[in-house]
A protein has these predicted regions:
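Hydrophobic membrane-insertion alpha-helices, especially the h-region
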Residues: 15-32
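N-terminal Lys/Arg-rich, disordered targeting/topogenic segments
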Residues: 1-10
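Histidine-centered active-site loop/cap adjacent to the catalytic His
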Residues: 13-16, 308-345
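Conserved SGNH/GDSL esterase-like catalytic core that processes O-acyl groups on lipids
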Residues: 115-192
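Membrane/wall-proximal cationic-aromatic binding patches
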Residues: 36-133, 300-304, 324, 345
Length: 345
């Protein structure tokens, strides 16, 4: 019986290459239609140093003192951002003079929601609170992309003596606290002393960690299949620490409360963006620890008209939030007792 003629080796190689290319193209198309990865549309400059920030040896970065006219891709014109000393954003036309030390102090800590991302100085929550209460000194320590852990470090640095301390908490801070891949991902290698500080729980104790960020691979920016491989690699690398993010975050909130109370102050958590189950869990936790909180579980929180295009609070939402946190908890006359101060209209 005659044997059938075998195809040339070159033909087999070519066929396999064509099959591989077609399969890769098909996989790319499926990932493209599925919108994967979500970070594909992130700013290609992410990881570079914005002018309004400077590196910090403990916090990773903080607001740089000065006045900045910033332009945003989805907004017309520019936004005036004024930063004072100590990494604070302005809450008044002039930075408080030395005699302000004799007035009750209100500190606001958090991420870009507190800082006032894409908002002018006068549209931010702390500025609005300052206008409602001219008899106190309000400080805005909110900083873009901060985690609860960085707010904890900032409280350790700046809260000395009695003060009313507010921390605006979003549920996505949990991932940042444990350095999940979504927070660490950068397109540009961080330089100039910038880094991502995070913490891990070891035998119940906080252990400080630092990361330069996870640089997106060159091919990940061009092939979604490669991006998927990098995604799973980063998820596996971070799994051990991210799985404990809820416990870690709750530990941070307890320590923040302890620091403020040790200084004879009052600590309050503002529960902002989170799912109903997350909100329920954090309410239960804060109540069990006797930590004061303001729950923003209101219909207005879901109103897209009160948000900027990227989801940050607008001035209108900040005006509402300033009402929701009333009566303002203020430590008066450097006494360890906190009392409510009525809103001034």
């Amino acid at each position: 019986m005659a044997h059938s003629k075998q195809p040339r080796r070159s033909v087999l190689v070519a066929a396999r290459l064509i099959t591989a290319v077609v399969s890769l193209a098909g996989a790319e198309a499926m990932l493209w239609f599925g919108g994967y990865p979500r970070w594909w549309a992130m700013d290609p400059q992410w990881g570079t140093t914005p002018p309004e920030y400077q590196s910090d040896s403990i916090l990773g970065w903080q607001n740089r003192a000065g006045r900045f006219n910033l332009a945003w891709p989805d907004l017309s014109g520019t936004t005036l951002v004024t930063n004072w000393s100590q990494g604070r954003r302005a809450t008044a036309e002039q930075e408080p003079a030395g005699d302000a030390a004799n007035r009750p102090r209100v500190f606001s800590f958090g991420d870009s929601f507190v800082q006032g991302y894409q908002l002018s100085d006068s549209e931010t929550l702390p500025w609005i609170v300052q206008q409602r209460h001219p008899d106190v000194v309000v400080s805005n320590f909110g900083t873009g992309d901060y985690a609860t852990y960085q707010s904890y470090l900032a409280i350790k640095r700046w809260v000395h003596g009695p003060a009313s301390v507010y921390h605006l908490f979003n549920a996505f801070h949990e991932g940042r606290n444990a350095a999940d891949p979504n927070w660490l991902r950068v397109y540009k290698k961080t330089r100039g002393g910038f880094f991502f500080p995070y913490a891990e729980l070891v035998a119940g104790d906080l252990q400080a960690r630092k990361s330069p960020g996870n640089l997106v691979w060159y091919l990940s920016r061009r092939l979604r299949t490669v991006a998927m491989i990098q995604d799973y690699r980063d998820i596996l690398e971070s799994y051990g620490r991210v799985r404990n993010k809820r416990q870690l975050t709750q530990t941070l909130l307890m320590k923040m409360n302890q620091i403020v109370r040790t200084e004879a102050g009052k600590f309050t958590v503002i529960l902002f963006d989170m799912s109903p189950p997350e909100r329920k869990d954090y309410r239960k936790f804060l109540e069990s620890q006797s930590i004061s909180f303001v729950d923003c579980d209101r219909p207005e929180l879901q109103d897209k008209k009160l948000r900027l295009p990227d989801g940050h609070p607008s001035q209108a939402l900040n005006e509402l939030l300033a009402q929701w946190i009333e009566p303002l908890q203020v430590v008066m006359d450097y006494s360890p007792e906190a009392r409510s101060v009525p809103e001034r209209r």
